[in-house]
A protein has these predicted regions:
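Hydrophobic faces of well-ordered beta-strands that scaffold small-molecule active sites
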Residues: 3-7, 34-36, 71-74, 102-106
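Active-site mouth loops of central-metabolism enzymes
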Residues: 5-17, 75-85, 121
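N-terminal beta1-alpha1-beta2 module of alpha/beta enzyme domains
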Residues: 1-66
């Protein structure tokens, strides 16, 4: 059995120093993975202001630079939130930087205000279609030298 740890993308006073203090312990204690939330905004009930979050993939790059063995990834990255070809580049870049330590958790997204602010909101059916199509394109971009792709979305 493997155990992972999840941390939020919220930032506050001395967040970098606190995180840097914890990272060696996380690896030392034998956690197999460290996952972060992939959100730019959180529901108000969580008590986090939008300007107190950091981009998940930027945070993971910071963590990769300060760790050596723990797997890194997102709890859930909503595929419809970003263009899939951009997400494929972001993920493969981090995988390269971290020497193959990336885990990509995916989903269709759920927080409408976040999509409204940073992307575009679609109904569940469309978001699930975009997720499946985006994954198909991303896999091709990672495994084929030349990609021709004509998706519905």
């Amino acid at each position: 059995m493997k155990f992972g740890i999840s941390i939020p993308v919220t930032i506050g006073e001395k967040w970098k120093e606190k995180l840097l203090e914890c990272l060696p312990q996380i690896e030392e204690y034998g956690f197999s993975s460290l996952l972060v939330w992939d959100h730019y905004m959180l529901p108000e009930k969580y008590g986090v202001k939008s300007n107190n979050t950091i981009d998940a993939w930027t945070l993971l790059s910071f963590i990769a630079a300060n760790t050596t063995k723990i797997k890194l990834g997102t709890c859930v990255t909503p595929i419809p939130f970003r263009p899939p070809q951009l997400l494929a580049k972001i993920v493969s870049s981090l995988d390269n930087i971290s020497n193959g330590r990336v885990i990509l958790g995916v989903g269709a997204g759920w927080h409408k205000p976040e999509f409204d602010a940073y992307s575009s909101w679609d109904n569940n059916k469309i978001r699930f279609e975009k997720t499946a199509e985006g994954l198909e394109l991303m896999k091709k971009l990672w495994t084929e030298d030349v990609v021709n792709f004509n998706g519905k979305h």
